[in-house]
């Protein structure tokens, strides 16, 4: 049945839940489910040539915004104020309410309520920090610099206490983020935040550099040949892989040197996700049967993927491209990361062009430079196809229409799409940005927060993600990316 249906109305009409993916569905563990998230064994190293060691340098690529940023709206300011008030005494942020996956005798079941412990965790803290950072506060300046410093110290301490071999950076388990988009999401998020704050941490810069080197080494070590990570299961693990890829790209822009195969694998995974190709790697962790959740009256135009879902494998999570059958997730992740990686490759391409022009360059140096330029051209060509597909898709009203239930996964996907569309700019970007601003403003709660209606429901993540979507025009991109692309070979 291809006719577009409003999310929950469609499910009601069909009389089934979890059969046709016409809307984002939750996959919350039923009471007494057999297993929750557990520590996964360390994956065996890939049988390949040794990886180039991670090296942190002091260099930074010149960056600027793709467009002139709008002044912070009252909606954004209200959301920022909410986040600041929710910071815990230890400097971190917790989920901000909502369910958790139980540990112990009832492992795997869903627990929630005012008596359920909600400790600060790395993942939610990182996303809150990123929102404050995008709004103009760093550890050394801005109206909320003290909050940023406290939050940064919180995540640095957790990374410092973490072992060096596994892909974990936290001992807090079974959060919504881990259950829904992957058990290693905390590591990927902290790598992203550290990469973005590199060079701006003030007195904490030395600790930040050491922590970034540690998280980068963990991720490089555990990335598999397909651009994913072993045992990174969940409802929609493509989204956590997307965060990992974005963190690699931002690290590269900010002076972190690492093996070029990491980017090649990540780029291949991104283009595959954009094309809707099946995800490779281990089977996803159990997440329970899919269940629809009744939306609140203020739910934002949910189910942007409603009419375009894959409609397969939704009961176990991780189906198709690891997107739970919701095309929004994989297309947003793939298109966003394709652009992310190209941003860094274009910087390399500009440097390579200079080598080719330099009469003093050796034959070997020119051969290597030409290889880089050729790789950039190939990446540009592939990215052009991906971005054209994305632009055409977001123009389709079915992709952003209907009123149903949005979870944190949708908010994150909106962000991925925003950061892809803004690089090219134009009508596709302005139309999308206007839709996001209007819809998110209507969905904001009176206290300034946003909450999810399915899957990731915690207010910290959803509020941070919504704010980042509305502040996408403040994202910094390499200056060379915003200039003319690499010139064709004559």
Regions of interest found by a model, annotated:
Residues 4-7, 24-490:
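Preference for long, amphipathic alpha-helical scaffolds in soluble/luminal domains
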